[in-house]
Design a protein with these regions (language model features):
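Active-site-adjacent segment of SDR/Rossmann-fold oxidoreductases
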Residues: 23, 29-30, 138-141, 169-172, ...
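A glycine-rich helix->loop->beta "capping" turn
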Residues: 6, 63-66, 79, 86-99, ...
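Canonical Rossmann dinucleotide-binding motif of NAD(H)/NADP(H)-dependent dehydrogenases/reductases
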Residues: 3-35
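Catalytic loop of short-chain dehydrogenase/reductase
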Residues: 146-170, 175-176, 180-184, 193-213
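A short, exposed helix-loop element centered on a Lys and neighboring polar residues
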Residues: 132-133, 176
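The beta1-alpha1 cofactor-binding region of Rossmann-like NAD(H)/NADP(H)-dependent oxidoreductases
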Residues: 54, 71-85, 114
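Substrate-binding pocket helix/loop in short-chain dehydrogenase/reductase
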Residues: 60, 108-109, 116-118
């Protein structure tokens, strides 16, 4: 275990699998105490299970790190507040927030339902706000904090992903504004634009296309 983040507390949303899991494990490896948030749903957001978050917490503890699971949805203000509250109640502070939770409801725009649009916007764009707002209350008081948001190259436009692209590009504007709002309080806010093969992005259709391309 490293010690670069010793004494720091981090929240990672959508940390049960994929990029979020890797982020949570790395933070713990560097000495941070981690709140592992994951609703445990399918890639489209349906269903829920505690096992993904629990498994990551176990991995961290098996490596002699400290972590706690949280199963709230980022799509509601109450869920976001409770995720941040979990860090305070368990570890007494918050230093790092990584907004990573996401779902997909891919469909060509002419076939996309309002419900499919709303579901993706709620988890990605609202989810970033719902966790960032209560975190910033704490960060402003302590005059320090780090926020890392998760955008995507799909924000520049991707076939069949009008909802996802809109949310991910919205996160870029949100990030820039939060950085300006919070910079005077010693808080940074940045976004990453990953291109990654994860459970969320490697759909059966994409997997079939990759196989055909071999």
């Amino acid at each position: 275990m490293g010690d670069r983040l010793k004494g720091k507390v981090a929240v990672v949303t959508g940390a049960g699998r994929g990029i979020g899991r890797a982020e949570a494990l790395l933070l713990a490896e560097e000495g941070a105490k981690v709140v592992v948030n994951d609703l445990g749903g399918a890639p489209d957001g349906s269903g829920e299970a505690t096992s993904p978050a629990d498994e990551v917490v176990k991995e961290i503890k098996d490596r002699r790190g400290e972590a706690v699971a949280n199963y709230d949805s980022v799509a509601t203000p109450e869920g976001g507040e409770n995720i941040i509250k979990t860090a305070i109640d368990t570890f007494g502070r918050l230093d790092i927030l990584i907004n990573n939770a996401g779902i997909l409801r891919d469909r060509m725009v002419f076939n996309m339902s309002p419900e499919e649009w709303d579901a993706v916007i709620k988890v990605h764009l609202y989810g970033h706000f719902n966790c960032t707002r209560p975190a910033c209350v704490i960060f402003r008081q302590q005059r320090s904090g780090r926020i890392i948001n998760t955008s995507s190259e799909a924000g520049l436009g991707n076939m069949g992903q009008a909802n996802y692209s809109a949310a991910k590009e919205g996160i870029v504007g949100f990030t820039r504004t939060v950085a300006r709002d919070m910079g005077r309080y010693g808080v940074t806010c940045n976004a990453i634009r990953p291109i990654a093969a994860t459970r969320l992005t490697v759909t059966p259709e994409l997997q079939a296309a990759l196989e055909r391309a071999k």
